[in-house]
Swiss-Prot record:
EC number from the UniProt entry: 2.1.1.72
Subunit structure, interactors included: The type I restriction/modification system is composed of three polypeptides R, M and S; the restriction enzyme has stoichiometry R(2)M(2)S(1) while the methyltransferase is M(2)S(1).
Protein family: Belongs to the N(4)/N(6)-methyltransferase family.
GO molecular function, a single term: N-methyltransferase activity
InterPro entries for this protein: D12N6_MeTrfase_N, DNA_Adenine_Mtase, DNA_methylase_A-5, DNA_methylase_N6_adenine_CS, Restrct_endonuc_T1M, SAM-dependent_MTases_sf, T1MK-like_N_sf
GO biological-process terms attached to the record: DNA restriction-modification system; methylation
Encoding gene, per UniProt annotation: hsdM
Binding site for S-adenosyl-L-methionine: 198-203, 230-232, 254
Keyword field contains Chaperone: no
Extra remark: Type I restriction and modification enzymes are complex, multifunctional systems which require ATP, S-adenosyl methionine and Mg(2+) as cofactors and, in addition to their endonucleolytic and methylase activities, are potent DNA-dependent ATPases.
Protein name, UniProt field: Type I restriction enzyme EcoprrI methylase subunit
Length: 520
């Protein structure tokens, strides 16, 4: 019987937590995450590679072959197809099987990771493989002070991941890698004092963003995330739509080196071949990649909120083709609109961008107001959606989603107030599938729905100083109790009458106590 996604998730969490308990103590949670995810990745590419070599032939078991039978031609063909090569002796299953008795485990793992990476040298996949295992440091003193201690903890991680009942990755209904990541972040980030929210967009929010960006498109040339994080948004697009709809693959840029590695691992883990994704490392705003790859038919992004950037301190940026049309740069203390303008520049004429934004950018004055004016005057703003608070890790802020389009059929701007659409779960709120469906139906129809959605004329937005706050246009539901004045007056009259009677009764009692006769 197939497990449901809830059962899969619960089982995965239980197993991962068991691994955590086995190695707890010397490695703090944040560093530990890299070892579990690195081992998970190592296991996956080993099984994936074995499956490729065996090609469905039950008579072949790649893991049992001797390394010496591998010819140069076999190796060359495999690297051209898969992007890397793993010898039978280097497979996860063979290393994990001997992990508890291998005195050279940490050195062997390091050699294997170097060999896998170097197998791609000189091939088109070189950049996609390089540095993937950089955060799996087998020599780290956090694993223990002696080689014996290091090996014991590495063995515990390998044996734990070996025991994960993963089955066929493609049959799983959940984003396995992302779910492991989400689980580890939520359990460790608070204790480690580090926030994982900027690196990971929860799957329920990712689902909504992907559907917004891909809505109505029968096919897209490629999908792009300028602040890719761990790749969760790009992968949600893959999960939401048939593989063939995204023709040329997945593109993203990420500034954090560790997260950049996680994003590349994530692509492989979801069976996206090296020639179907391109994740670059670097600062999107000042060192943008993919200028030759644009435009993109679908852009999804959850960029960092209100981060500082060089802005006007770099005099060349105002002439940059991404920012020049607006005539002004985003404030140095708040780069939010710089990411928006970057995405707009990379968007195709038929495409959509769905970007998570800090709410302040929609109503503040100054440069941000001028950028809003540019976006509205050129009819790029399709929809602004306000979400419920506490949907993301690391922030309780109620954020917005900005949907940009270059192919609108009218000049109206749609506003959707989804702030009441959420389900409370432990420390965070979530969007259910029903909530997402409700938002998408309103988004698609562009119909006005009381207290939920309103399509506003261009002239109204202009008259409102280009304010794009949802609350300025969608009237919140009045949750105050409706008072019936006539009924209230009647109740008041009855109450006053009762009070008068009580006073008389009290006076009578007092008079009796004092021995006086009450006058009638």
């Amino acid at each position: 019987m197939k497990m449901t996604s809830i059962q899969q998730r619960a089982e995965l969490h239980r197993q991962i937590w068991q691994i955590a308990n086995d190695v707890r103590g010397s490695v703090d949670g944040w560093d530990f995450k890299q070892y579990v995810l690195g081992a998970l990745f190592y296991r996956f590419i080993s099984e994936n590679f074995s499956s490729y070599i065996e090609a469905g032939d039950d008579s072949i078991c790649y893991a049992k072959l001797d390394d010496s039978v591998i010819t140069d031609d076999i190796k060359d063909d495999a690297i051209k197809t898969k992007g890397y090569f793993i010898y039978p002796s280097q497979l996860f299953c063979n290393v994990a099987a001997k992990a508890n008795t291998n005195d050279r485990l940490n050195a062997d793992l390091n050699s294997i990771f170097v060999a896998i990476e170097s197998s791609a040298y000189g091939y088109p996949s070189e950049a996609d493989i390089k540095g993937l295992f950089a955060d799996f440091d087998t020599t780290s003193n956090r694993l223990g002070n002696t080689v014996k201690d290091k090996n014991a903890r590495l063995a515990a991680v390998l044996k734990g991941v070996e025991g994960l009942k993963l089955g066929d990755f493609n049959e799983h209904q959940i984003d396995l890698f992302g779910d492991a990541y989400e689980f580890l972040i939520s359990n460790y980030a608070a204790n480690a004092g580090k926030s994982g929210g900027e690196f990971f967009t929860p799957q329920h929010v990712s689902k909504l963003i992907a559907q917004l960006a891909m809505h109505g498109q029968t096919h897209v040339n490629k999908i792009y995330d300028p602040a890719a994080g761990s790749g969760s948004l790009l992968l949600q697009a893959k999960k939401q739509f048939d593989d063939h709809i995204i023709e040329e693959g997945f593109f993203g840029q990420e500034i954090n080196h560790t997260t950049y590695n996680l994003a590349r691992m994530n692509m492989f883990l979801h069976n996206i071949n090296y020639d179907k994704f391109d994740i670059k490392l670097g600062n999107t705003l000042t060192e943008p990649h993919f200028r030759d790859e644009k435009p993109f038919d679908a852009i999804v992004s959850n960029p960092p909120y209100s981060v500082k950037w060089i802005g006007s301190d770099d005099p060349t940026l105002i002439n940059d083709e991404r920012f020049a049309p607006a005539g002004v740069l985003a404030p140095k203390s708040k780069a939010d609109f710089a990411f928006v303008l970057h995405a707009l520049n990379y968007l195709s004429a038929k495409g959509r961008a769905a970007i998570v934004c800090f709410p302040g950018i929609f109503y503040r004055g100054g440069a941000e107001q001028k950028i809003r004016q540019y976006l509205v005057d050129n009819n790029y703003v399709e929809t602004v959606i306000s979400l419920a608070p506490n949907l993301f890790f690391g922030t309780t802020i109620a954020v917005n989603i900005l949907v940009l389009s270059k192919h609108k059929t009218d000049t109206k701007v749609q506003f959707i107030d989804a702030s009441e659409l959420f389900k409370k779960e432990t420390n965070n709120n979530i969007l259910t599938d029903a909530h997402i469906e409700q938002i998408m139906q309103v988004f698609a129809s562009k119909e006005d729905v009381a207290h939920l959605a309103k399509s506003v004329a261009f002239e109204t937005v202009v008259a409102n100083d280009y304010n794009l706050s949802v609350s300025s246009y969608v009237e919140a539901k009045d949750t105050r109790e409706i008072i019936d004045i006539a009924e209230l007056n009647a109740e008041l009259k009855t109450t006053v009458s009762k009070i008068d009677q009580l006073r008389k009764d009290i006076d009578a009692i007092v008079a009796e106590i004092e021995g006086c006769e009450v006058q009638k």
